[in-house]
From Swiss-Prot:
Subunit structure: Part of the ribosomal stalk of the 50S ribosomal subunit. Interacts with L10 and the large rRNA to form the base of the stalk. L10 forms an elongated spine to which L12 dimers bind in a sequential fashion forming a multimeric L10(L12)X complex.
Key word rRNA-binding present: yes
Organism of derivation: Xanthobacter autotrophicus (strain ATCC BAA-1158 / Py2)
Entry-linked InterPro entries: Ribosomal_uL11, Ribosomal_uL11_bac-typ, Ribosomal_uL11_C, Ribosomal_uL11_C_sf, Ribosomal_uL11_N, Ribosomal_uL11_N_sf
CDD domains linked to this entry: Ribosomal_L11
UniProt keywords, alphabetically: Methylation, Ribonucleoprotein, Ribosomal protein, RNA-binding, rRNA-binding
Gene: rplK
Database matches in Gene3D superfamilies: Ribosomal protein L11, C-terminal domain (1.10.10.250), Ribosomal protein L11/L12, N-terminal domain (3.30.1550.10)
GO biological process, one term: translation
Entry similarity comment: Belongs to the universal ribosomal protein uL11 family.
UniProt protein name: Large ribosomal subunit protein uL11
Modifications the protein undergoes after translation, according to the UniProt entry: One or more lysine residues are methylated.
């Protein structure tokens, strides 16, 4: 017989640096899950990824206080900031204060958008890569990025 699911926890955790501090500790502790077990397993699975990359994770909690988790691909905004060169160690990048009003904070090309679409395809609600590119293009515009090409 399958285990009874008691709930889901959705978090965004930096790759390779999960620790029991908030937001992980309180979210898992509330459900009675072993926090350190999750942190070790998550860090082991994300060790090959770029350290600090935000990774969405869906944790399924079971009645016997065990859990499973599924890693998703990083958010589109992370890839767009990286492609536009906004994300640096010294100054964390942010989008435009007034998107769509003529002030752009960076530029991305269609080739970069299709590359991002290929990476995100399994997590997007799209049938084709072209539809995914259009969706990501909309995200880029709402962040104040100029799409070229």
């Amino acid at each position: 017989m399958a285990k009874k699911i008691t709930g889901y926890v959705k978090l965004q955790v930096p790759a390779g640096s999960a620790n029991p501090a908030p937001p992980i500790g309180p979210a898992l502790g509330q459900r009675g899950l072993n926090i350190m077990e999750f942190c070790k397993a998550f860090n082991a699975q994300t060790a090959q990824l770029e350290k600090g990359m935000p990774i969405p994770v869906v944790i399924t909690a079971y009645q016997d206080r065990s859990f499973t988790f599924e890693l998703k691909t990083p958010p589109v905004s992370y890839f767009l900031k990286k492609a536009a060169g906004l994300e640096t160690k010294k100054k964390p990048g942010s989008g435009s204060k007034t998107p769509g009003k003529g002030t752009f904070v960076g530029k991305v090309t269609r080739a970069q958008l299709s590359e991002i679409a290929e990476k995100k395809m399994k997590d997007l609600n799209c049938e084709t890569v072209e539809a995914a590119v259009q969706m990501i293009e909309g995200s880029a515009r709402s962040m104040g990025l100029q799409v070229q090409g």
